[in-house]
Amino acid sequence: MADPGSVRVVDEEISLVPYYPNEETALPWYQDPDVCRQVDNIDYVYTSERLNAMYTYLNTHGACYYISYRGVLVGDVSLRNSGELAIVICREYQNRHIGRRCIRAMLDLAREKGMERVTANIYSFNTQSRNMFLSLGFRETGGEWFALEL
């Protein structure tokens, strides 16, 4: 679980804010059918219950942060204790290299935690995310899994 109050500054535009219950802001991200397909390969949107269960799991099994871009919360990023990374950025803020910068910061966090390897599960149709992870040095390890040795 992230240390409350331990905001991680990524750069002058982005900071990672430790998870706190904020359904009003986060639920709309997960009610975009395209985002749900990219992230979970599902054809339905999240309910409040599903959202809260996801965040509870991520926050108790690793570090979970909201992504603040120029003072606006635009998504979330997590690093599970198992080394699995996940990131979601709402559609309006995609294609601004926010994800790339956040994943770099999460790689730093993984190193701080002494992790030797991180992974990401990225669906084959999500070429945007696959390309971003590959550009950061991740390699396909089979199926829809990618890994980076730290």
PLM features: residue spans?
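Acetyl-CoA-dependent GNAT
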Residues: 41-92, 149
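Conserved active-site alpha-helix within GNAT-family acetyltransferase domains
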Residues: 100, 124-142
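Conserved GNAT acetyl-CoA-binding A-motif
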Residues: 110-123
